Amino acid sequence: MNTPFYVFMKLLPKCAVSRAFGFLTRLKLPVLSTVAKNWFASYYKLDMQEAEFPLEHYKNISELFIRHLKEGARPIANSEVVSPVDGVLSQSGPVENMIQAKGKTYTLASLLRDEKLAEQFAHGSFATIYLAPFNYHRIHSPVKGKVIGASYCPGTLWPVNKGSVERIEGLFCINE
């Protein structure tokens, strides 16, 4: 576990770095924002034909990151299961055997940080979908319903890339 990556990430003030990065992505400095948006769209090969507005419309990277899509850009498939997001399905299965990666498992109670809430989902299923920076970052409900509650689970801010998922024990349970 004590790889150079792990040691570096462990020592890195992740909360401060995250806040600083968030601040920088929300800056509305026309010249800097234009350069940053163009680089981001080019580097990650964003398909701006799907976006509701052209690249020039977005005032900063943050707005670009959470952009809306044009109506009909994501038609709902006629299938039993529909993904709520763009991304890659990395794991799925019964909640009694939740897999992080490479045999690392965790419990639903440790993920939710609530034993009673976890009991309500006993015998259910889970899916872990990884959203890369280039993915569309809005979540759409794959079923009709009404949100009746939400909870915030504070934690660390480890990256959730493949390297972290494979190396950090209980990553999804300790992350915010």
Report the location of each language-model feature.
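Non-catalytic terminal segments and appended small domains
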Residues: 1-176
